[in-house]
């Protein structure tokens, strides 16, 4: 694979440099065909904000973030743009640390005189971490395009096939308890060898009926995980874990209330016959670190598209690997499959989208949306960066800026 010739600016010291020239955001929203809910929330729409980072060499990187309010994320992206214009996009660590400094007070940091963004109010920290993530993912896309290599190869990975699983079983008003079984049978037909069922919104008796129906249609060889969305205290979750043990559950995901701490996960892990997974809603490596250090987790989840970006996900992945906790990133397979490909047996796999209903934007946005092939794997291509192109006609059709 040859490298492209690029007109690169050279400083007086002879150092080749590329510069960031612009950050653009595209907030998008689509109404779902059918509202559904989890134990955590009701969803009637899907939202995503696309990030573009432009350079003076014509290389454009793309990133995406979930969450909201989207107008706040876009406003913060404009503020962050002022701090990074002219910086080298290949210096992702320096850029990440510079933007992260805006999330906390610092001595002498009341203004931007020191070249760093002024500290944000605490209620804007989640949106700030999302904006950092969107920019950071785009920088990694630039890095791959600059080197004319896919991101997984920049990380030292060689695998072009990554194990994947699909999530389903969202609650829909009026559907019988076992209705999700047909959806999961479809996942298996598409090639998935692992699936994840939404649970936690109903009582144990009704949940057992749903779990039993799914296990029967997927068979004993397909891995079954439960995504609980934080509904339980420790004691109730212990009872739940013991009740579902006969169905050979691979992990319990986000089982405990949001305010419970690593020590509570330790209490649950000591009594649960099923391994625990957690991490997708943690803002940074600093809180994830405490869960890993507790020894309570069998799987650590993180989401580059929710908080902090690909750089922070890499930090978490390395720390998890060092401590013997399996890596299982949350959603965004077109991004996270690159990370999984580089971590070998330390990574469980990437979560992909088995259906369009819950993730219509991802399927409309990208030329290729990573999905399971008949062999139950996501297949990575050899295109540079994250390996996808953006359908901007689709972006315009669902943009909130229209």
Task: List each language-model region with its residue ranges.
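Short, Lys/Arg-enriched N-terminal segments with co-localized hydrophobic residues
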Residues: 3-17
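Conserved, mostly hydrophobic/aromatic
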Residues: 20, 58, 80, 135, ...
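Metal-dependent enolase-superfamily TIM-barrel catalytic cores that perform enediolate-based chemistry
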Residues: 156, 160-272
